[in-house]
Curated annotation (Swiss-Prot):
GO MF annotations in UniProt: ATP binding; serine-tRNA ligase activity
Pfam families noted in UniProt: Seryl_tRNA_N (PF02403), tRNA-synt_2b (PF00587)
Protein name (database record): Serine--tRNA ligase
Intracellular or extracellular location(s): Cytoplasm
Top-level taxon of the source organism: Bacteria
Assigned keywords, A-Z: Aminoacyl-tRNA synthetase, ATP-binding, Cytoplasm, Ligase, Nucleotide-binding, Protein biosynthesis
PROSITE patterns in the record: AA_TRNA_LIGASE_II
Reaction equations catalysed: tRNA(Ser) + L-serine + ATP = L-seryl-tRNA(Ser) + AMP + diphosphate + H(+); tRNA(Sec) + L-serine + ATP = L-seryl-tRNA(Sec) + AMP + diphosphate + H(+)
């Protein structure tokens, strides 16, 4: 959530920056904001006047009583009672206005950092660097579906059990998928200093509100009503949501917490399934594992000092890149433009891995600095050197999406006979195997 003081101080500048993002007209109703702010200011001024008058009358009552002027004192008491009624009405309306402003701000995305390229959509993204050279094959390249099905990828069973965009893995490919996740989590903990966490896969609305998925993106989530306890009926609003990413529970570790400055940075990682409705993705990537309702991901989260967050962004991007480098998968790093960034991000890098069957790079990781946007919703703070509470900055990134990494391994390491060479980094997790074959 944006700092309302920033909007009060320089609304025009904030709106200009918001207008560089996707669908700017949906972000902030400037006229409604200004109207509420004008009413708030007027009410606050009137409230202060009433409080001052009440205080003066209260002093007068004591003086009048001391002088024995009982009738005048009673008249002053009556006026204080009248002022209290008006003060109560003002306080009620002020609370309503604050609630309306809060609701309005919950729908407003983060402001892009000055270094973010301006663009309307993904065509405006800028390549920062690339690593590795795509392999040249001397046979017809198959996509991951054709490579993976003989090895245990079962899309028909996924449809039978759950519907479209679900996949079943069996045998050697299931083991390779597990090996990838284990390799990633070991790399992030052993080499990069993250603390491994096991998190709930269902969270409450407050958690999703804190990280920015609610209330604006409820349609992207899977909701499940909580079961009643001891035969009690279930309230309509007693919902849990399946996590769209482990970023949600990990970042919420610091909700309503004040940490000591010397505890920063806090570096957390988790391997979890992720659940997404993929609303708005009808007809896109319908073949294979690229876009699924359920997929595994190793997530990285850092909670840092505000002055260190852009340094942390570069570090985290490097941590995601390390996975691809150790697997020998060619990739490029893209700096997302203003029109392609996620709702809560101030700056984002996407890692895109080379997929030979598509002859292109596809997203496999996003790493974002949210600055204080999530922390303000979460009230996640640290005590600074002056002893004052200050909002932390939060960052999150994929390290990596396991399913898409499996896709990249199958396509980049395929052989003419249908087998798949297992990358060296994964062989310790595969019992020393060098080949995956049916």
């Amino acid at each position: 959530m944006l700092d309302i003081l920033l909007l009060r101080k320089d609304l025009d500048s904030a709106v200009a920056r918001l207008e560089t993002r996707k669908k700017p007209q949906a972000f902030l109703n400037v006229e409604a904001f200004q109207s509420l702010e004008a009413e708030r200011k007027s009410l606050q001024t009137r409230t202060e006047e009433l409080q001052s008058k009440r205080n003066q009358l209260s002093k007068q009552i004591g003086m009048l009583m001391g002088k024995g002027e009982k009738d005048a004192a009673e008249a002053a008491k009556a006026e204080v009672g009248s002022l209290k009624t008006e003060l109560d009405q003002s306080a009620t309306r002020l609370e309503q206005i604050q609630g309306e402003l809060q609701t309005m701000l919950l729908a407003v995305p983060n402001l892009p950092h000055d270094s973010v390229p301006v663009g309307a959509d993904e065509s405006g993204n800028v390549e920062a660097r690339r690593w590795g050279t795509p392999k040249t094959f001397d046979f017809e390249v198959k996509d991951h579906v054709d490579v993976g099905q003989p090895l245990g990828l079962d899309f028909d069973m996924g449809v039978k059990l759950s519907g479209s965009r679900f996949t079943v893995m069996k045998g050697p490919i299931a083991r390779l998928h597990r090996a990838l996740a284990q390799f990633m989590i070991d790399l992030q903990t052993d080499s990069h200093g993250y603390t491994e966490c096991y998190v709930p896969y269902a969270v409450n609305a407050d958690s999703l509100k804190g990280t920015g998925q609610l209330p604006k993106f409820e349609g992207d989530l899977f909701a499940a009503k909580k079961g009643g306890q001891d035969g009690e009926p279930v309230p309509d609003n007693a919902a849990l949501y399946l996590i769209p990413t482990a970023e949600v529970p990990l970042t919420n570790f610091v909700r309503d917490v004040v940490v000591a400055e010397d505890q920063l940075p806090i570096k957390l990682t988790a391997h979890s399934p992720c659940f997404r409705s993929e609303a708005g993705s009808y007809g896109r990537d319908t073949r294979g594992m690229i876009r699924q309702h359920q997929f595994d991901k190793v997530e990285m989260v850092q909670i840092v000092h505000p002055e260190k967050s852009y340094e942390a962004l570069e570090e985290m991007t490097g941590h995601a890149e390390a996975v691809l480098q150790k697997l020998g998968l060619p990739y490029r790093v893209m700096s997302l433009c203003t029109g392609d960034m996620g709702f809560g991000a101030a700056k984002t890098y996407d890692l895109e891995v080379w997929l030979p069957a598509q002859n292109t790079y596809r997203e496999i990781s996003s790493v974002s600095n949210c600055e204080a946007f999530q922390a303000r919703r979460l009230q996640a703070r640290f005590k600074n050197a002056q002893g004052k509470n200050e909002l932390v900055h939060t960052l999150n990134g994929s390290g990596l999406a396991v399913g898409r990494t499996l896709v990249a391994v199958l396509e980049n390491y395929q052989n003419a006979d249908g087998s798949v060479t297992i990358p060296e980094a994964l062989r310790p997790y595969m019992g020393g195997q060098t080949l995956l074959k049916a």
